[in-house]
């Protein structure tokens, strides 16, 4: 039955497919919002109305891309599909909870979209800082709906995290240790731990904001002895681990892709890669206040957060150089997935370098809330997370569907996307250094040139997104079946054929230790 299979699904592959489709759909919505932003900023003067509308679009763009595109695709889609296959488990540990995790997302998305349509919408930015998010500056239900949306998305992620942690720790074959699982499995495990530890703090913060708005509490209101800075601490204690949650599964996928298309049987420095991810996960929790260098912290506090933030560059560097070492001496196959992976390494490194610039508290005081910050995090998200998703998608597409994408189209798609995102975000570094502030719908004429170029780049990216839809249609319509897959001895997910049967690993796997 259709309903039994897709509505009441307990199969990790089907739920993974649902996550993928939902994430792709949300990605279209988020892309549409980003095109609205770049259309508004394409030239000086007003296009879409006042700044409230503009900020509602910016806020929705951020929430949609983070909570309904990147996280569902990376953790829900790739995680559900690949983790059980990679560790030889018959399914996830809690299959029905897995289904609930997915079905909490569409209502959450609905609440977020509803928040934009009631009153004047939630024009708070994705950070939802009070007093702007309080009931005076944002009277009406908009921010409340956004908070409920975040609650649902948060519950979904927490349940998913519990599920992945249990699955990865308990459902491996007894003969293998955690240090014999693939890097993608490790990345999902670490991501799940980060989610489990950070989301409750966000839930606390936004619940306090909810009571401030509706029940007359004063957690964040100085008039009653509260402090708006407390909200910033609570939010960023979640918000900083969150950005690592968005990129860590990507690290795992890139490790697999680089290894596979270099013709290697294992990545360079496996243990170093694992420890680097664990270090990044740990350090991600003790650097949150680098988002708050401008709120007037003590100089010694700023010194600590500056140095702690810079330390994260070390494990990140370990990962980048290990990827390069994996490429070294390999029989490199220039497949589309490999192009995405190489693009990821290059552009993520650039994003990391601007991150090091911003970690200096003294420099950040000048650059905070300018387009330099926007350029920085879009290099790591729009060219890190998205390139990893695209690389993983074209690499595992034959596994998910049993069909192959057209190689030439896939390479053309990569090229258009590469040009588009760089043309969009590279000029924003110049705008930021010239002092153009974020979250404004209009700007002085002096900034016109780079903004126009940036907006042109965004339309090139839009072309790439449309081409991707065509590519998927073309692949599903042409039905070129997969003949054989290489390197299956170290890529366990492929051993059941493409696509794998509905139930895999129905009996425990026999592990033979090889002394090679």
Swiss-Prot record:
Segments on the Mitochondrial matrix side according to the record's topology features: 1-11, 87-94, 171-182, 262-269, 328-335, 401-406, 479-516
Binding-site residues, Cu cation: 240, 290-291
An example molecular function term from Gene Ontology annotations: metal ion binding
Lineage top rank: taxon: Eukaryota
Primary site of residence: mitochondrion
Cofactors named for this entry: heme; Cu cation
Protein name: Cytochrome c oxidase subunit 1
Organism field: Zygogeomys trichopus
